[in-house]
Regions:
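Basic nucleic-acid-binding interfaces
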Residues: 1-74
């Protein structure tokens, strides 16, 4: 299992946008993104650093593996 990087919520969103996620709506300190095909809905907190457990839960909801996510960051 690959080790998750420590990244900000905004960097997480930029990476998820590469997989087809688009802005649904900003909601205070959280940002909601949605992908139509295959359908997925994620809520990402706008924090400077996301906890690894939070990032893992976001990736699970997005249907993206840790390895795919790390490859998209690079």
């Amino acid at each position: 299992m690959s080790k998750l990087p420590v990244i900000s919520g905004r960097d997480c969103l930029k990476t998820l946008e590469k997989t087809g996620f688009r802005l649904r709506r900003p909601e205070g300190s959280h940002m909601v993104r949605r992908r139509v095909e295959p359908y997925a809905h994620v809520v990402v907190p706008d924090h400077r650093e996301l906890d690894r457990g939070t990032l893992r839960a976001i990736l699970r909801g997005a249907g993206v593996t840790v390895e795919e996510f790390i490859a998209l960051i690079c």
